[in-house]
């Protein structure tokens, strides 16, 4: 087995974050100024940016963030984390059986995708907003940002069976405060923002390292005879 693998089987283009590298540095509060000065002096063209810019670049690269895009049911196959964060040849770690079983036998029930949101809509969806295919819930938006070049976009966990070319919509809660012809300020009204997918994890549910034939198929046939 290779050390790592990706869930891009059958996709026409490479993962947008395949060559993206980023990291977080934790420093004492009283050392922040010195660290920033060293960073700016370390090379030409460096500049400071805020957390929203960081989020925009992360979402553009299709990289999930712990505690934002990951819930208690998530497995690394759904997030394409087998590409960078899971070693396939090391054993004896919590969750190893689930990782191996899903890689060899199963298909991850959900898949991470980038959503390009309708730029004409005013409000952005909140993280946790429902993604719909027609009237059916197809998944949930996990991170949402307004990118400086690409406009509104999001990461979303979708059901694996959602077609890659499906027209989706994300629910947006808009406040009625200040709206005309309303007798009182009621609860927020749910509207929808159209969304187009950029597929990160193949709907086929197979990784590059997945076996061509399900393991044990021959044994099963011999038992039947």
Model-identified regions with their sequence ranges:
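Acidic, low-complexity central loop/insert segments
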Residues: 1-64
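Short, structured patches in soluble enzyme cores that scaffold and shape functional sites
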Residues: 13-16, 23-31, 58-63, 90, ...
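Conserved active-site beta-strand-loop modules that form the wall/rim of enzyme catalytic pockets
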Residues: 23, 56, 68, 89-91, ...
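A short secondary-structure junction signal
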Residues: 23, 34-39, 70-72, 111, ...
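Conserved active-site and cofactor/substrate-binding residues in soluble primary-metabolism enzymes
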Residues: 30, 34, 54, 93, ...
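Short, acidic Gly/Pro/Ser/Thr-rich loop/turn segments
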Residues: 32-34, 66, 163, 204
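Active-site loop ensemble at the mouth of alpha/beta enzyme cores that anchors a bound cofactor
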Residues: 61-86, 90-94
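Glycine-rich, small/acidic residue-mixed loop/short-helix segments
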Residues: 74, 82-86, 96, 100-225
């Amino acid at each position: 087995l290779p050390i790592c693998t990706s869930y891009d089987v059958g996709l026409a283009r490479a993962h947008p974050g395949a060559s993206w590298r980023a990291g977080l540095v934790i420093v004492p509060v009283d050392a922040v100024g010195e660290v920033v000065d060293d960073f700016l002096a370390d090379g030409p063209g460096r500049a400071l940016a805020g957390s929203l810019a960081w989020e925009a670049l992360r979402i553009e690269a299709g990289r999930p963030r712990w505690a934002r895009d990951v819930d208690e049911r998530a497995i690394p196959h759904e997030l394409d984390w087998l590409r960078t964060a899971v070693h396939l040849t090391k054993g004896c770690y919590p969750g190893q059986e689930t990782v191996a079983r899903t890689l060899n036998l199963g298909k991850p029930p959900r898949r991470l995708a980038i959503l390009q949101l309708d730029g004409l809509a005013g409000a952005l969806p909140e993280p946790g907003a429902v993604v719909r295919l027609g009237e059916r819930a197809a998944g949930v938006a996990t991170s949402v940002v307004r990118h400086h070049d690409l406009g509104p976009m999001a990461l979303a966990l979708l059901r694996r069976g959602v077609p890659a070319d499906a027209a989706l919509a994300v629910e947006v809660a808009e406040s009625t405060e200040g709206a005309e012809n309303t007798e009182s300020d009621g609860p927020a009204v749910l509207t929808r923002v159209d969304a187009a997918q950029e597929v990160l994890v193949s709907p086929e549910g197979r990784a590059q390292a997945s076996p061509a034939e399900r393991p044990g198929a021959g044994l099963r046939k011999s038992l039947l005879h």
